[in-house]
C-alpha cells in the first residue's frame, strides 16, 4: 500500500471513509490512487444520507455504497422486493425510502456534462442521478437534492480540491479517460508451457522460433525456387503483370444509386437554441424546441411532392406532436405506427399447417427465390455531397472530445499543440456536424432500445455545437447551441442478437426541394415556411423560404448502432495519421516542426479538370475525415469486399512505383471479384471511379501494369 496516497487520504477524510476506500482497493485490485477517489465518493454519499428522516421518523435514506459487493447486492434486491420494484442490473449508491427510488451519485472534475451524459446513457431514468463537480456544477435527471445537502457536499468538495492542489495531487489521483489502470502480469509456468505448445512445426519452443525470426535473412534465389516449386503444384499459371496488364474497372449501368444514409446530410435544415445545462436530456431538448420555437405549427400538406404512404406519415406526425405535448414521448399503437414500424408484417417462410388439414405438396413448401438488388450507376450527387462535407459549417465544436491529459515531456507538448490545431480545423466542418448528429441521436436511440424495447418512442435528431463568433472572440465560455434536425420514431426493439434489427421512422427538416434520383426512398411534404438569415454586405437580413418535411422508414441494427454512436473514432483515426507524420518529422530534426509540416507537406486529394490536386496536410485533414466517416455510414458487405480486393491492385501499383516485378494467378478474376461488389453502394461506386482515375494517371506517368481502354 502506498504511504503517500494513504497519508494524504487520512489527512482530510473521515477514518471510516479511509477504511472503506482501502478495503475496496484491496477487494477490486485497483491502483492505490483510487483510495482518495473512493474515499471522497463514500463521504459525499454519507453527507447525502446523514440526519434525514422520513415523515414517520425513520431514516429516509439507506446507504448501499461502502458495503462488500455480496452484501450490497443482497441489500438492493431486498429493497426491490420490499418496495415492489423491478430489480436493477447494476448497483446503486443510495435508496430513498420516501421516493421509493434508488440514487446514483457521481463526482467529476470536468467542466461540461459529458460524465453525466455517459451515466445517463447507461442508467436512463431507472434511478435518480446526481453528478457533483469540484467547481460547483450539478447535473441531474430529476428534482433535488435539498439545498442543505448541496451546500454540505459542495463545501466538502471545494475543501478537498484545495487540499489536494496544495499537495500537488489533484491531477495525480485522476487517470485520463482513455487510460486504463495498469495491471502488472507475470508469466506463470502454465502460460509458458502453453506458449511453447502453440508454436508451429518444426519449432519446439517459442524462444527457438523467436531466435529464428530475428536472425532470418531472405535469399532471393531460394525464394524463387520455392515459388517455382509451388507453381508446379498449382494448376493455375503465374501471370506477370507486365504481360497481363490490368484493365479499368467496369462500372454498372442503369439508374443512379439512391441516397442510403440513415439521416439527411447536405439537405438537412436545423433549428437552433442556446443550450440549457439544466435541460440537457434528449426529451427535454425536444420539448423546449416545440415550446419556444413553435414547431407544432409545422403541418404537412395533404399531397406530397413525392413518395408513398402520405396518409400514414401525416397521421404519425400528428401523433408525434401529441406525444411531445403531453411529455410522455410515447406513441400508442395504431394502424399508422404499426404499418410504418413494420409491426406484424414479418413474412412467414413456410406456411403453418395443422395436422387436421390435408398434406400440402412439395411445391407449396418451396420458398420464393431471393431477389438480388438491382445494379445502379455512379450517382452524380455523391461528388457534390462529398465536397459539401469537406467545407466549414456555420458552427463549430460538433464532436464531444475528451480532455487532454497533462503533458510529461516536450514531445507530448508538440502532440498536444498539434491535436488542438487539427481539432480546430476539423470541428467546424460539415462532416463533424453529421458525426455529432449520429453520436447523440443514435446514442439516444440505443438508450431507448435498452430501457423501453416494447414501446414506440419519440427521439430528437439533434446535435450540440458552439458559436464560431464566441470561439473567435476568445470568450471564456463559448455559447453552446442545441441543434434540432428532425424527429425520429423508434418502433419496438427486442434486440436479442447482435444482428437484430429495429425500425425507425425519420421526419427531417429541409429548405431544399427533393432530388427525385437522389431521394427515391423519401416521402416529401411541403410543411410551411421558415426564416433564413442571409448576409447582404455588412448586414444580415431574414428571408422567408419554404420548409419541407422529409419522411422515411428505415432500420438500424445493434452493430450499426455501435458504429454510428462511436463515430468520433473517425476523428481520432484521422488525427492520429497526421500526428504520426508530424511527430516523425520533429523527431528526425530534433526540433518542433509541427507547424512547418502541417503547412508545407503536401497530400494528393483528388482530380479536377483532368489534373491532380494537392493540398497541405492542414487542409487534407478534411478529406481524410470525410473518407473515414463515409466508411462508417456506408459500411456493408459490398464495401468490405471491394476494399479487401482493391488492396491487391494498390500493392501492384506500389510495386510499379518502386520498379519491382509483380505477378499473380488470375488478374482478370481479381477485377471480376471487384466488379461483383459494385451493385448499389454509393461509396463503392465512388471509390471504383477514383481507382479508375488513379490507374489512368499512373499510366500517363509510365506505369507498366495498367492499360487504358
From Swiss-Prot:
Top EC class per UniProt? Answer: hydrolase
Can you cite an annotated GO cellular component?
host cell cytoplasm
UniProt motif (Nuclear localization signal 1 (NLS1)) ranges: 109-124
Q: Write down the Gene3D superfamilies for this protein, in alphabetical order.
A: Influenza RNA-dependent RNA polymerase subunit PA, endonuclease domain (3.40.91.90)
Entry note: cofactor: Binds 2 manganese ions per subunit.
Q: What does UniProt say on post-translational modification here?
A: Phosphorylated on serines and threonines by host kinases, including human casein kinase II.
Q: Which parts of the sequence bind Mn(2+) 1?
A: 41, 93, 104-105
EC number, UniProt record:
3.1.-.-
An example GO BP is: symbiont-mediated suppression of host gene expression
TM helices/strands, residue ranges: none
Location in or out of the cell: Host cytoplasm; Host nucleus
Q: Where does Mn(2+) 2 bind?
A: 65, 93
Keywords attached to this entry: Cap snatching, Endonuclease, Eukaryotic host gene expression shutoff by virus, Eukaryotic host transcription shutoff by virus, Host cytoplasm, Host gene expression shutoff by virus, Host nucleus, Host-virus interaction, Hydrolase, Inhibition of host RNA polymerase II by virus, Manganese, Metal-binding, Nuclease, Phosphoprotein
- According to the UniProt entry, where does the motif Nuclear localization signal 2 (NLS2) sit in this chain? 166-228
Q: Which InterPro entries does UniProt cross-reference here?
A: INFV_PA, PA/PA-X, PA/PA-X_sf
State the needed cofactors, names only: Mn(2+)
Q: Which GO terms describe its molecular function?
A: endonuclease activity; metal ion binding; RNA binding
Source superkingdom: Viruses
SUBUNIT field: Influenza RNA polymerase is composed of three subunits: PB1, PB2 and PA. Interacts (via C-terminus) with PB1 (via N-terminus).
Primary role: Plays an essential role in viral RNA transcription and replication by forming the heterotrimeric polymerase complex together with PB1 and PB2 subunits. The complex transcribes viral mRNAs by using a unique mechanism called cap-snatching. It consists in the hijacking and cleavage of host capped pre-mRNAs. These short capped RNAs are then used as primers for viral mRNAs. The PB2 subunit is responsible for the binding of the 5' cap of cellular pre-mRNAs which are subsequently cleaved after 10-13 nucleotides by the PA subunit that carries the endonuclease activity.
Q: Which family does it belong to?
A: Belongs to the influenza viruses PA family.
State what protein this is by name: Polymerase acidic protein
The species is Influenza C virus (strain C/Ann Arbor/1/1950)
Amino acid at each position: 500500500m502506498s504511504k503517500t496516497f494513504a497519508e494524504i487520504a487520512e489527512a482530510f477524510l473521515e477514518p471510516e471513509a479511509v477504511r472503506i476506500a482501502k478495503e475496496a482497493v484491496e477487494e477490486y485490485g485497483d491502483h492505490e490512487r483510487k483510495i482518495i477517489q473512493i474515499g471522497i465518493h463514500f463521504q459525499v454519499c454519507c453527507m447525502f444520507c446523514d440526519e434525514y428522516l422520513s415523515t414517520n421518523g425513520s431514516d429516509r435514506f439507506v446507504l448501499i455504497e461502502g458495503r462488500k459487493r455480496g452484501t450490497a447486492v443482497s441489500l438492493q434486491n431486498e429493497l426491490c422486493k420490499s418496495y415492489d420494484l423491478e430489480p436493477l442490473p447494476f448497483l446503486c449508491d443510495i435508496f430513498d425510502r420516501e421516493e421509493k427510488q434508488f440514487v446514483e451519485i457521481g463526482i467529476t472534475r470536468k467542466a461540461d456534462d459529458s460524465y453525466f451524459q455517459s451515466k445517463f446513457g447507461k442508467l436512463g431514468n431507472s434511478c435518480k442521478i446526481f453528478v457533483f463537480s469540484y467547481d460547483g456544477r450539478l447535473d441531474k435527471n430529476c428534482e433535488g437534492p435539498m439545498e442543505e445537502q448541496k451546500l454540505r457536499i459542495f463545501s466538502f468538495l471545494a475543501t478537498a480540491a484545495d487540499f489536494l492542489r496544495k499537495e500537488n495531487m489533484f491531477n495525480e489521483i485522476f487517470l485520463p479517460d482513455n487510460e486504463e489502470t495498469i495491471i502488472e502480469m507475470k508469466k506463470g509456468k502454465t502460460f509458458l508451457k502453453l506458449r511453447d505448445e502453440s508454436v508451429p512445426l518444426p519449432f519446439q519452443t517459442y524462444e527457438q522460433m523467436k531466435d529464428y525470426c530475428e536472425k532470418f535473412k531472405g535469399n532471393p534465389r531460394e525464394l524463387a525456387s520455392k515459388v517455382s516449386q509451388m507453381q508446379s503444384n498449382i494448376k493455375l499459371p503465374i501471370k506477370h503483370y507486365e504481360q497481363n496488364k490490368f484493365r479499368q474497372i467496369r462500372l454498372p449501368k442503369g439508374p443512379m444509386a439512391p441516397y442510403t444514409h440513415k439521416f439527411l446530410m447536405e439537405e438537412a435544415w436545423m433549428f437552433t437554441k442556446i443550450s440549457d445545462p439544466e435541460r440537457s436530456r434528449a426529451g427535454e431538448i425536444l420539448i423546449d424546441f416545440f415550446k419556444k420555437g413553435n414547431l407544432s405549427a409545422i403541418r404537412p400538406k395533404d399531397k406530397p411532392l413525392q413518395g408513398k404512404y402520405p396518409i400514414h406519415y401525416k397521421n404519425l406526425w400528428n401523433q408525434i406532436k401529441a406525444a411531445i405535448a403531453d411529455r410522455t414521448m410515447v406513441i400508442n399503437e395504431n394502424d399508422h405506427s404499426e404499418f410504418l414500424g413494420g409491426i406484424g408484417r414479418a413474412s412467414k417462410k413456410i406456411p403453418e399447417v395443422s395436422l387436421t388439414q390435408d398434406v400440402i405438396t412439395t411445391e407449396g413448401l418451396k420458398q420464393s427465390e431471393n431477389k438480388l438488388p438491382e445494379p445502379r450507376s455512379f450517382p452524380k450527387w455523391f461528388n457534390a455531397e462529398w465536397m459539401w462535407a469537406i467545407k466549414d459549417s456555420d458552427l463549430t465544436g460538433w464532436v464531444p472530445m475528451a480532455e487532454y491529459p497533462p503533458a510529461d515531456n516536450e514531445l507530448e507538448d508538440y502532440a498536444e499543440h498539434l491535436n488542438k490545431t487539427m481539432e480546430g480545423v476539423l470541428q467546424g466542418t460539415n462532416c463533424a456536424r453529421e458525426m455529432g448528429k449520429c453520436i447523440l441521436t443514435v446514442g439516444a436511440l440505443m438508450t431507448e432500445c435498452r430501457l423501453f424495447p416494447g414501446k414506440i418512442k419519440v427521439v430528437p435528431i439533434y446535435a450540440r455545437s458552439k458559436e464560431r463568433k464566441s470561439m473567435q472572440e476568445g470568450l471564456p465560455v463559448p455559447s453552446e447551441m442545441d441543434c434540432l434536425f428532425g424527429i425520429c420514431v423508434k418502433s419496438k426493439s427486442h434486440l436479442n442478437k447482435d444482428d437484430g434489427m429495429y425500425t425507425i421512422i425519420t421526419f427531417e427538416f429541409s429548405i431544399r426541394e427533393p432530388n427525385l434520383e437522389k431521394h427515391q426512398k423519401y416521402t416529401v411534404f411541403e410543411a410551411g415556411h421558415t426564416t433564413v438569415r442571409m448576409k447582404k454586405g455588412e448586414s444580415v437580413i431574414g428571408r422567408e423560404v419554404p420548409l419541407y418535411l422529409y419522411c422515411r422508414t428505415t432500420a438500424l441494427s445493434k452493430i450499426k448502432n455501435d458504429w454510428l454512436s462511436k463515430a468520433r473514432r473517425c476523428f481520432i483515426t484521422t488525427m492520429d495519421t497526421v500526428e504520426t507524420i508530424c511527430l516523425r518529422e520533429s523527431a528526425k530534426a530534433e526540433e518542433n516542426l509541427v507547424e512547418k509540416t502541417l503547412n508545407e507537406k503536401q497530400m494528393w486529394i483528388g482530380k479536377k479538370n483532368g489534373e491532380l490536386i494537392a493540398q497541405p496536410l492542414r487542409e487534407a485533414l478534411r478529406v481524410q475525415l470525410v473518407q473515414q466517416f463515409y466508411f462508417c455510414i456506408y459500411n456493408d458487405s459490398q464495401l468490405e469486399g471491394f476494399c479487401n480486393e482493391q488492396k491487391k491492385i494498390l500493392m501492384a501499383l506500389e510495386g510499379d512505383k518502386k520498379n519491382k516485378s509483380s505477378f499473380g494467378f488470375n488478374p482478370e478474376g481479381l477485377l471480376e471479384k471487384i466488379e461483383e461488389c459494385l451493385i448499389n453502394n454509393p461509396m463503392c461506386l465512388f471509390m471504383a471511379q477514383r481507382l479508375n482515375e488513379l490507374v489512368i494517371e499512373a499510366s500517363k506517368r509510365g506505369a507498366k501494369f495498367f492499360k487504358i481502354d
